A protein has these predicted regions:
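Structural alpha/beta core scaffold segments of enzyme domains
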Residues: 1-444
Length: 444
């Protein structure tokens, strides 16, 4: 059996509670201190450095708190260069704030037109998937999203064809917004799965169970973790899925007609270079800093907890500082880009390098505790990811500083003993080839 359906998704605008605003403090020495609504202070710093030719040392961007962004702060919006331009020209401090109406004048989630074709056997097992998507962009810049690849990784299917094309329109360039690409692409895939369940007269939850896969077929690798089957089971139990009647207009809640449905989702966990610095003062208080931001995801709290756990300290004895471009490098703060993996290896050495009672005050050399499973422990020898400096034999200990830099781990070299990768995942439909379909969408 086959399902062939076309789905349209509309534009969506971020419109967070806090509108975009930039305050540029022009200092007497010509340097700029900028308070901006951004998900990446160092990204804004780099942008201004390239646009205005200013040295990075003369630009400091801060974003202590961000009142929501949803992706609209991943790149600088136009109020930032306007504020900097005015400040440099007037040689005085300037603030530019966008109105609520102006919040509709820049990036947005682009509209899409997607065609999903599914082929399955009588038991609902997927035999072929073809997902073709057409997205929009501006005429002066290409904006692409990961719209179709989710269809090749969420379910088990050996024959998959994916295509994505752009149509240049007289509009402003779109922008990443809350699970960019997946939020649009998964709508089409899951709607098509529901239509397949209806055509095959199979419960939509059971259909997804039958097509579950533990591997990402797009990359030929197993998932590091995937608890989707357990999620299916718990969700069905808690919502009473067994009481669902699949017939339309068959279920009521009081005087209202209701329907029960479900859908799956998938999202990527990206890792980028990140770094942090940890500092113990003479009172034993740990301060950890990184140039990441808090966009309402609780970064202040989470990073403080991670640092406290790694250092063996109380939460109230740890302070996490963020939102400053002068701090150690961190990636853009988004739902899939985190700096937490740099905080733990940074704070952990401090656990051994700073005795809880600061016995160095008495002029004695601290005794480093042995790491479990090792004969002895030497901070300089074992903390390969950290550059550590600490005082020795001093009656007035200087602060202890630990810095850590992490980057994503490269993929291991291919193993000769492993099975060869799957052949190119293609499926040729009898109606229209992928190439012809894409061209007709662009030029039709």
């Amino acid at each position: 059996m086959q399902v062939d359906a076309t789905y349209l998704t509309a534009n969506e605008y971020h419109n967070p509670m806090e509108p975009h605003a930039s305050t540029v403090l022009y200092k007497a020495d010509g340097t700029l201190e900028i308070h901006d609504k951004t998900q990446g202070t160092q990204n804004c710093q780099d942008y201004l450095h390239k646009v205005f030719g200013l040295p990075k040392a003369s630009i400091r961007v801060r974003a202590a708190f961000v009142g929501g962004a949803f992706g609209s702060g991943l790149r600088p919006q136009y109020q930032l260069p306007l504020a900097v331009m005015a400040a440099l020209h007037l040689q005085r401090s300037v603030r530019v704030t966008l109105t609520r109406q102006q919040m509709f004048t820049f990036g947005y989630r682009p509209r899409t037109e997607q065609r999903l074709r599914l082929g399955a056997d009588v038991n609902g097992q997927l035999l072929a998937i073809a997902h073709d998507a057409l997205g929009q962009t501006s005429r002066f810049e290409d904006f692409t999203e990961h719209v179709v690849e989710w269809s090749g990784m969420l379910y088990q299917c050996d024959n998959v064809a994916l295509s994505y094309r752009l149509a240049s329109l007289d509009v402003y360039t779109p922008l990443d917004m809350r699970a960019p690409g997946a939020a649009s692409g998964m709508i089409a895939l899951e709607c098509a799965m529901d239509e397949l369940a209806c055509a095959a007269q199979i419960d939509p939850l059971e259909l997804r169970r039958r097509n579950f896969t533990a591997n990402n077929a797009n990359e030929g690798k197993p998932y590091s973790s995937k608890e989707l089957l357990a999620c299916y089971r718990q969700g069905a139990e808690r919502f009473g899925w067994q009481n669902r009647n699949p017939q339309p207009r068959s279920m009521r809640h009081g005087n209202q007609l209701i329907g029960w449905g479900m859908a799956g989702g998938v999202w990527e966990a990206m890792q980028m270079k990140a770094s942090a610095k940890a500092r113990f003062d003479a009172q034993g208080h740990l301060t950890v800093c990184s140039a990441t931001t808090d966009i309402g995801t609780g970064t202040y709290t989470v990073m403080t907890q991670i640092a406290a756990d790694a250092a063996g300290a109380r939460v109230q004895d740890v302070t996490f500082v963020l939102g400053d471009s002068s701090l150690p490098t961190a990636p853009l703060q988004a739902d899939r880009l985190r700096c937490r993996r740099s905080v733990r290896p940074c704070a952990r050495p401090a656990r051994y390098c700073a005795p809880k009672c600061w016995n160095m005050r008495a002029g004695c050399t601290p005794k480093w505790p042995a790491r479990p499973g090792s004969r002895s422990f030497s901070p300089m020898a074992t903390c390969t990811r950290a550059a550590i400096a600490w005082p020795c034999r001093t009656s007035s200990p200087a602060p202890l500083t630990v810095s850590s830099k992490c980057k994503s781990t490269p993929s291991p070299a291919p193993d000769a003993n492993r099975s060869p990768p799957l052949p190119i995942r293609q499926y040729s439909w009898k109606s229209t080839s992928t190439r012809t379909l894409a061209q007709s969408r662009l030029h039709g």
